[in-house]
């Protein structure tokens, strides 16, 4: 979906199921723009990362990051080979030594808003809205997305925001 969006002339279609990272207001259950902490919400409750089919939380974001810290080189999830390390490597700026920066502290979960601001160029909803005049016609009929209403990793929330945005853009006659 991201490749189709960023390179609409190069690809002739995308078929996406439970797409990751389409709107960073819901990066799973983290709003990277507003939240202060990735591990706990504004009420002090642990943020779930993965849920079972019945909705029961299997593990939290904090637990997942702690596990990735354990398997990562230098005790950092950035080197774990896991999803969280991968997203930081792709979306975030690099440090002077080439190491990917982390959007949040790997031990406390405190979000670094200066890094979050640099992720915005990879927020597909924001990018699509900003570039809709030229992008809309190029994407016509090319994005094929399927999403259930209860994704295990809470990806459906971001997709709902993306869908609402697309409906608004299309209703303004900018198809």
Where do the model's predicted regions map?
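Non-catalytic cap/lid and distal C-terminal segments of serine-dependent acyl enzymes
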Residues: 1-175
